């Protein structure tokens, strides 16, 4: 047995340092080294509790090293749509998540397999919600023995990473019973119950999936939308289970003009499709996110793509910040965390991202960074209240809060403050 006295513990971002150790193993034969390996690990203890919220629905709540953890983060699919992300490039992506004050990434359907992803999550204190390769349309597989062998290899290969916080069987569904039982029993044996195995990503202590749209902040403060997707009831429950722990909620996120120019030919820049042109296309993502309509309603019609992109960043900030702040407002009373869909783009896109494919931060990036700061002051646009949100381990006393109002040109127009 390896005994470490007074170890420095591994902590997620915002709760302490992600301390790591390196163990060097050497195998010798007749006094000569035949093989050696360095193993990096962190010392931590994950725990999980179901705590009923205000609507008496159990909420999955995470603890690490005895400390209750408020989850803030986002979902990843692929690292890059042509599988060209390797090595140090993962560090750039993970550091951007740390900079947004996130502490968790959910690997949707386990799309990322590179060791470097986990290494940098360990290094920067980003916990990993680790899915297996099943989702709502496919909860069974053609060759179950091959699936089981891959699952066993995955757990054995990754279990030493302190960043892995939970294993999850399937996205928005449960694995077929035989696979579900295998995964639960295998993880209990191979990971020694160090991390929870959870069958489904959005049920059983979790509050569903969605919304996916650009609702104003006031909307999110007033309703969790846990029974809705694209504003069409009822999914996945048919009733509202409160804010709870949400593993998916997302919006369209328009990139900056500098990035749009890189993947849209100039002849297609302008004009954008009108609401009238799209009114009968119910499956159009633009319609489902209400993006163009909201930009035009709040900031006026644009005369060019560049002007529209500039205004879009203001909406990106407002909507992303509003979602996180609505969950902040209910912290420990009704909910335990929020993971947005998605925080990382695998390709050039107009939806589901914080920074874009070219690493240019959108307004959503700055909205997330602000709302997720470890000590945050926020305004509830529904009841006009001000609240200080503290997700650190330290009590806050004698703090001075200051609010400053700027116009759209960045000029200060009013300010006031208070000590409490």
Model-derived features with residue positions:
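Secreted/periplasmic carbohydrate-active enzymes, especially glycoside hydrolases
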Residues: 1-104, 108, 331-335, 360, ...
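Short, well-ordered amphipathic alpha-helices
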Residues: 3-6, 24, 184, 321-326
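Active-site-adjacent substrate/metal-binding segments within catalytic domains
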Residues: 7-8, 24, 32-166, 280-310, ...
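A broadly tuned preference for mixed-charge, low-complexity surface segments
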Residues: 23, 125, 158-179, 222-223, ...
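A general secondary-structure junction signal
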Residues: 45, 201, 342-344
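Substrate-binding/catalytic cleft of secreted carbohydrate-active enzymes
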Residues: 104-282, 315, 319, 335-337, ...
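Substrate-binding clefts and catalytic carboxylate motifs of secreted carbohydrate-active enzymes
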Residues: 229-397, 410-413
